[in-house]
Amino acid sequence: MKKTGYFLLAVIVIVAAAGVGYWKFSGNPDALREIVLEQCLPDQLQHQNPAPCAEVKPRAGYVVFKDRHGPLQYLLMPTYRINGTESPLLLEPATPNFFWLAWQARGYMSKKYGHDIPDSAVSLAINSRLGRSQDHLHIHISCIRPDVREQLDNDLTRISTRWLPLPGGLMGHEYLARRVTESELAQRSPFMMLAEEVPEARDHMGRYALAVVRQSDDSFVLLATERNLLTFNRASAEEIQDHSCAILSSR
């Protein structure tokens, strides 16, 4: 009986992994990289025109790009080759703090919307190696799901300054949560916080997805979820976002 159970479990894992692989590679995983390196960066350097990006900062090492999904979603991406959360470059002190830069770029959402969008409605997210469709690092700048916003508001006083499991998880998946100040977020990359503070995370960064959300007390919550095929968790932190931005119509 036990052997049968183990066999079925193995089959489930294999099928789940195959499904993830198909989903990931069914398109062009280098599409974003080609846009950045072959269009946005050359156009900015040669013609001082960031198109098709919204902004190109060669010296700072990043671009901001309007994503085609959702009316207000933007992506922050490096101007050089970094695949994703698994890249050792993200743990180098000289690497830009991409999450902080993404937070500074949230104003593009308001500009597109035509009105100021409150910080509480904004979220940042990056997916894991198997939870993404593109192999160029990109942080999603978009609206937070209203139900996730409500849950994090309710958990405000229970979120520690250490990485601890978020009570109840999010979207049916387990998450770690850590509270940081604005100054901490500006000075230290969430990638480094995860790698240095969560046991064994440094050696398996590609398994993790990360998100950043502003709280009502002006602190930030860092959220991390680890890939777990047994629970069908591809570690896609983008799941906490709502690219249709329903939260704006409820305010």
Curated annotation (Swiss-Prot):
Name the InterPro entries on file: CDP-diacylglyc_Pase, CDP-diacylglyc_Pase_proteobac, HIT-like_sf
Membrane topology classification: Single-pass membrane protein
Pfam families, alphabetized: CDH
Identify the Gene3D superfamilies for this entry.
HIT family - CDH-like
Q: Name a GO CC annotation attached to this entry.
A: plasma membrane
Q: Which UniProt keywords apply?
A: Cell inner membrane, Cell membrane, Hydrolase, Lipid biosynthesis, Lipid metabolism, Membrane, Phospholipid biosynthesis, Phospholipid metabolism, Transmembrane, Transmembrane helix
Q: Where in the cell is it found?
A: Cell inner membrane
Single GO MF annotation: CDP-diacylglycerol diphosphatase activity
Biological process terms in GO annotation: CDP-diacylglycerol catabolic process; phospholipid biosynthetic process
Q: What is its main location?
A: membrane
Q: What's the EC number here?
A: 3.6.1.26
Q: Which residues cross the membrane?
A: 5-25
> Under which pathway is this protein filed?
Phospholipid metabolism; CDP-diacylglycerol degradation; phosphatidate from CDP-diacylglycerol: step 1/1
- Which reaction does this enzyme catalyse, per its entry? a CDP-1,2-diacyl-sn-glycerol + H2O = a 1,2-diacyl-sn-glycero-3-phosphate + CMP + 2 H(+)
Family in the record: Belongs to the Cdh family.
Protein's name in the database: CDP-diacylglycerol pyrophosphatase
**Organism field:** Salmonella typhimurium (strain LT2 / SGSC1412 / ATCC 700720)
What gene makes this protein?
cdh
